[in-house]
Regions:
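N-terminal membrane-anchoring alpha-helices
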Residues: 1-13
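Rossmann-fold NAD(P)H-dependent dehydrogenase/reductase core
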Residues: 11-207
């Protein structure tokens, strides 16, 4: 955070999204662990009336319970369910899509692709860590897994849009794309840096 941004916080009110009536809307929010953007997104959308499905690699039932208790304490009728999802695992992604179709019907108004990982915050990795199917771990999770999930749920989104007039995919990103290096996409000899790789993934999500 810049000094200018820090000082600005003392004089300018934090902007909040305008409340939207989401009654009857069905929303999936990936990566909803407590304390995350996904968790607060799910809580806000549920407060606005949406039926929300949250995902996580962790204990989803505990996340759902925490959301329900928090919403009920705020006087909101909780409409939150959840299911495990590991974007690093292609079968987990397909299983979630099957579960959603079987348990949540033929409607999906919004898919919020929030889940992502960065497991090398201190940039100590000298070589890429690979997923079980041979992809760089962050690429497999943040990009390939997200694209697969979107592709598998896209028919429901299209159907919902045709029937109800609107449906959308929201990809959550960050400013880390500014650390990307385009030449790394074409130069196989470029040394590995997890932050630059993460930035390239974030840049790809914006295309």
């Amino acid at each position: 955070m810049s000094i200018r941004s820090w000082l600005r916080g003392f004089f300018v009110d934090t902007p909040f999204a305008q409340v939207v009536n989401l009654e009857d809307k069905q929303v999936v929010v990936t990566g909803a662990s407590p304390g995350s953007l996904g968790y607060e997104t799910a809580r806000t959308l549920a407060r606005w009336g949406a039926q929300v499905v949250v995902t996580s690699r962790g204990d989803v039932s505990a996340i759902v319970q925490a959301l329900q208790e928090q919403l009920e304490a705020e006087g909101v009728a909780a409409r939150v369910t959840g299911h495990p999802l590991d974007l690093c695992d292609a079968e987990s992604v397909s299983e979630f899509a099957r579960w959603y179709r079987e348990h949540c019907g033929d409607r999906l108004d919004v898919l919020v692709n929030n889940a992502g990982v960065h497991l090398d915050l201190m940039a100590k990795w000298k070589e890429p860590r690979l997923s079980d199917d041979g992809h760089e771990l962050q690429w497999r999770t943040n990009y390939l897994g997200t694209v697969q999930l979107t592709h598998e749920l896209l028919p429901l989104l299209k159907q919902t849009g045709e029937r109800h007039g609107d449906a959308r995919v929201v990809n959550v990103g960050s400013q880390i794309h500014s650390r990307s290096r385009n030449e790394a996409l074409f130069d196989a000899d470029t040394s590995y840096n997890s932050w630059k790789f993460y930035g390239n993934i974030d840049l790809n999500q914006r295309k």
